[in-house]
């Protein structure tokens, strides 16, 4: 059938509507109906000419030998015949040849209904993208493409998972966004090479069980998943680094999510999560980016401070009332927040910091407090190492018979409590008692040991404080020395005939310089732990993670007229703000799935932001919906950016409700939201709507 289409298209001078020849579109579906015809008549001649020129520019001739072909938005019904050139002639299709060169074929946003078997004439095809077409199934012969690794078939018409995909064993990346898939077959486990899977915007009710074992990136956003419990996530936790569960219906984070120890990016946007369990969050040691916007969270667990790799955390649209109170109402100056500001349990923060400070005791070290000769105990500044070594260090601390300490001059009395040989009174000989000792004597011994342990703990904290100060001072001096060495190098380059007095000091090898620079970068990226002494003589720990970004102030829509808001898609995500401002209706002028159908009433107008799109036909329906929303509470109108489609819908309502002309409605709308910019096609339709209103 495919060959007949090609032969027919290449021999007839008058081709069927929508046919393709040499990669150029020769005609397509026209708008039908009275509304569409009126709209076409309203377009100016110059606009039509511009559209034809744009269409010609979009067409791309395939150059023989090219490895990539783009044919997006071409209204193709089939794969262009021009691609099958340059190689051995096919026996099945005599007019076509094998193309060994083509490796990437991208035909998104066309009208392809099926994948023809002649695609097997592209044996080295590595990337096939047929997104936004009209596919309903995947043929079995596609598995003959042994080099195919990336397959993109999102935004098609699949009502169930295409089983033949499970036979393409070479796949490493599969994209099936925006279909109607409800589950995954067991055969899907056969794709052992699959690393990147996107099932965004489908109808999954739960996290699928049949996830291949080596998945690294998993996108399950915008489904109907209500439970975060999943055995499959535990099974793939060894490889999983990116997980997207945003725009679902998750209310609780199951303890099984503690398995995500290798995940670096976790997205939980737009769910119904109220609490983040500390035991779960504290397990995400590798986490770099954590997205939690537009949930119902009012408090972060203190364990978040232990995530030493965390650099970005998004908390927008949540219920952090304490942080809201800190913002001055009359100042536009941005306020800087620390992660501790979002944690209510401050005592737990300090406890965690103390518990995760690493003390490494040394042995056989003699301290002379008179001449200030002492040995500095080496510790690590990374929280990761602190946590990993904590238990071992605690055990060493109890077993070691000697310890090195550094004391201030005002702590000499405490120093006297340690004997001259620094022997701790914790050995069996120090507290050897007879079997007939009384119970009272045992209690006294226990108290004595406890006092000794408390004294040691105080000394350790003092030691750590001084040690950190010394390390900071040493770090500064090293930086000074490094800068001095660099200046000397520059100076010697300017005076090539003069020899440096100390060649070892000034002539640093290039490899050594790189190592020093890398070491400095690593030091900057590591968390810094400092101890400070408060006025109450209580030692406090401050843990600072440099370069950490916290997002929590979300974008809100603009009020155009009473009870009518205009904004972008993010504004429609902010359920807390919407509920606080009594919004009951949401008009979405784009192809977006309702996020909170249980909280708000939605009207979805599926229309693209292009000049040719017919928004005029939806004015009546949209105006009635906006009217209803304003009567019951308030209405938000949004598209993707809140600039063109939603702005046009807003102006149409203002024109209808107040009997205003287009320019008057435009002035009102742009005053409330200065960034609006409707496309020329929408403007022409609004002007036509004006004529209809004033007939």
Curated annotation (Swiss-Prot):
Biased composition (Low complexity): 413-426
Record's catalysed reaction(s): O-phospho-L-tyrosyl-[protein] + H2O = L-tyrosyl-[protein] + phosphate; O-phospho-L-seryl-[protein] + H2O = L-seryl-[protein] + phosphate; O-phospho-L-threonyl-[protein] + H2O = L-threonyl-[protein] + phosphate
Tyrosine-protein phosphatase domain mapped to chain residues: 556-695
One Gene Ontology MF term: phosphoprotein phosphatase activity
GO biological-process terms attached to the record: negative regulation of MAPK cascade; signal transduction
Residues of the active site: 639
Repeat keyword on record: yes
A GO CC annotation given for this chain: cytoplasm
Domain of life according to the entry: Eukaryota
Record field: transmembrane: none
Disordered: annotated segments: 413-438, 492-519
A Pfam family of this chain: LRR_1
Family assignment from sequence similarity: Belongs to the protein-tyrosine phosphatase family. Non-receptor class dual specificity subfamily.
Protein name (Swiss-Prot/TrEMBL): MAP kinase phosphatase with leucine-rich repeats protein 2
Organism: Dictyostelium discoideum
Gene that encodes it: mpl2
